[in-house]
């Protein structure tokens, strides 16, 4: 083992939580280092939408309709309940604006409100239909220099400088059904041409967020070691004093005088942990999380006595298992002319539910919990040719043919009739026909009498305003008909190390493991089994990473 490296704070993981912890430490008088197992930095945060759900932040105060932070508190308590700890909820609400402002001061963080991107439960007291989510503006990442080459790749990469924001996607997915489609498409094209002319390196969504945070680390001269795997934590008299890592094939000890922050993501790519903790069917091939997320930080925490919670849950989303990468379905389920059935040919939910809730319904039981296999899996998204002609689907433009490899893989099935479609996917044809007929009646009436699809502002965000009287309901009548296989995909796992309001890791008896902190998907979620709104994963990751570093630096004066 090589000579010891000594830092005040050692941060494991280079996603949003890890970078926020290191930045906070550096600007509060501590020396810090970030270690990253992968050969690229950014983690799942770089593959995400990059949005933040942080009520009361300065961007919302400036751009969004007046909001009461107490309403956000009421809302979050209302949807989460007591299972994730009421003190942590209050801490998140109270400290969020402070964290946002800190990042604005010490990084080129530049965000904007996403109008109308609703909270995921807007009808709950305190929920907001106009939304509380902010997203990164397009960011020229040339300032990163050579570091840009090792940024974790985007989930859905495109041509250089052809980048889309969440606000762009909202205007494009309806195609020519949306009168704003052409103006927005022209604006995107002009942005692309200008960026190419100026030789920019534009990034949006999670790519932009992580490039902004990485800029802050570079400005603060915080070292980041790539290809450095966490092996173990070292304790001295009950306190974590550092970590053993493997770098360039050699194990070495990195001493942490103030503490270690585990921000290494979840365990979505660990088949063993998913098999142990999560309900079937499950696998590592349906996630869009970073490949390095194999639960290393969680296991190391457990090895020193840490408790874990919510290990059976994830940041789920119904997904299509396409041959190369899974497609995480956002708008597809909300658009008129589609419905979801189980293998019995029955609808079992409002298809337009927020993605975590929708996948919980696919598994069945309260919050998707249970001991047996999922009750409504496999599931199928059924749609017709009119739907395909009108709307984008899984990255395809309206009317674009379904790729042959999708059909050959079984991810998507096509047939001239509903009866033939049912036979091909193993669903009772008569039941499927009856289900579609009943649904078509709801579509013509404009009211889903079974599941209330289209009644929530969240449902309508991805709906078609030109579809009357309900933007989420349309009859399936024009063949050929299609079935896209729906699997329980995810953005990452939810469960992790139990922490308190200072992000200190706790044992099962509630006692603190001194010197050990956790944030992000390595920690148990403040959101519990729910998901408050767009950006409700990264928002808490930033806040509790900041609080971990602040706690570690508590006896030292801040530098700004």
Model-predicted regions and their roles:
Residues 200-207, 219, 247-327, 538, ...:
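Glycine-rich loop(s) and the adjacent beta-strand/alpha-helix scaffold that form part
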Residues 232, 236-239, 431-526, 530:
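A glycine-rich dinucleotide-binding beta-alpha-beta segment and adjacent secondary-structure elements
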Residues 37-223, 340, 347, 386-389, ...:
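Conserved N-terminal/central alpha/beta ligand/cofactor-binding core
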Residues 13, 246, 256-257, 262-264, ...:
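Short, well-ordered coil/turn residues at beta-beta hairpins
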Residues 1-9, 27, 207, 211, ...:
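Extreme N-terminal leader/targeting segments of oxidoreductases
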Residues 125, 130, 135-183, 298-300, ...:
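An anion/pyrophosphate-binding glycine-rich loop and adjacent beta-alpha core
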Residues 9-34:
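N-terminal Rossmann-like FAD-binding beta1-loop-alpha1 element of flavoenzymes
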Residues 300-307, 433, 540-559:
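Internal hydrophobic alpha-helix adjacent to the cofactor/substrate pocket in enzyme cavities
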